[in-house]
Amino acid sequence: MGIRSFRPYTPGTRQATVSDFSEITKSKPEKSLTKYKHRKKGRNNRGVITCRHRGGGHKRLYRLIDFRRDKRDITAQVTAIEYDPNRNARIALVQYEDGEKRYILQPAGLGVGDTIIAGEEAPYEIGNALPLYKIPLGTEIHNIELYAGRGGQMVRSAGAFAQLVAKEGDYVTIKLPSKEVRMVRKECYATIGKVGNAEARNLKLGKAGRTRHLGRRPQVRGSVMNPVDHPHGGGEGRAPIGRSGPVTPWGKPALGKKTRKKKKQSSSLIVRRRR
């Protein structure tokens, strides 16, 4: 993937950068692997806003991604690399020997014509899915299962990878992109390689309109609101917040307050917390 910039015809084009989409080989998605996605716009079942600053955005079709990789010991060939509006990573359309088609996250280095396979005896190659106990130490992996058979839940964003650092008993230890080190059951599957499109983090939106296309609405600072709307609001001109520390619109401590449950069951599997 390359990054394009523009001549400064407008303030928006002066700042913006976009992907050149050079790796995309197919423009329209596979119809059988898409479904309509009803967007919540930050509302719950009663229509009450539960997540602020969400709404609008371009309509999208959801691509059904195979995170489970549960079609075992059957070779598949990559037939296309596609754009997915629901994530920064690219997706690869693969076709199995029996004719079935599926989408997977495109690992860096996987292209059209390459073959992949999932299974305990799968070779050690990019795009193949294996149980963690079969993967050599130091390997870069992604799409990692937390529970065997549930499908990959960790390390799925563009450019992300984790590293296998130890194997002991029924667990393996992995180092996550957040620098957290945690243990996972050895039967859980992971895919070899790192997720492609790592340059996505370097893109600049350049203008408010592109942010709105993504479904994000403006964020208004609490300090410029009225006291009825936010605890930081009110005062004459630029006033301090008038509290010992910043709080949420509902008065709870914000910015630095730990929110993880102290008795969370998975805490026993975390060797080192993220920084």
Curated annotation (Swiss-Prot):
InterPro entries: NA-bd_OB-fold, Rib_uL2_dom2, Ribosomal_uL2, Ribosomal_uL2_bac/org-type, Ribosomal_uL2_C, Ribosomal_uL2_CS, Ribosomal_uL2_dom3, Ribosomal_uL2_RNA-bd_dom. Residues 12-22 have a biased composition (Polar residues). Residues 1-24, 208-275 are annotated as: Disordered. One of its GO terms (molecular function) is transferase activity. The keyword Signal does not apply. Keywords: Ribonucleoprotein, Ribosomal protein, RNA-binding, rRNA-binding. Residues 208-219, 255-275 have a biased composition (Basic residues). It comes from the Bacteria. Pfam families: Ribosomal_L2, Ribosomal_L2_C. GO terms for biological process: translation. Belongs to the universal ribosomal protein uL2 family. One of the primary rRNA binding proteins. Required for association of the 30S and 50S subunits to form the 70S ribosome, for tRNA binding and peptide bond formation. It has been suggested to have peptidyltransferase activity; this is somewhat controversial. Makes several contacts with the 16S rRNA in the 70S ribosome. Part of the 50S ribosomal subunit. Forms a bridge to the 30S subunit in the 70S ribosome. This is Large ribosomal subunit protein uL2. The gene is rplB.
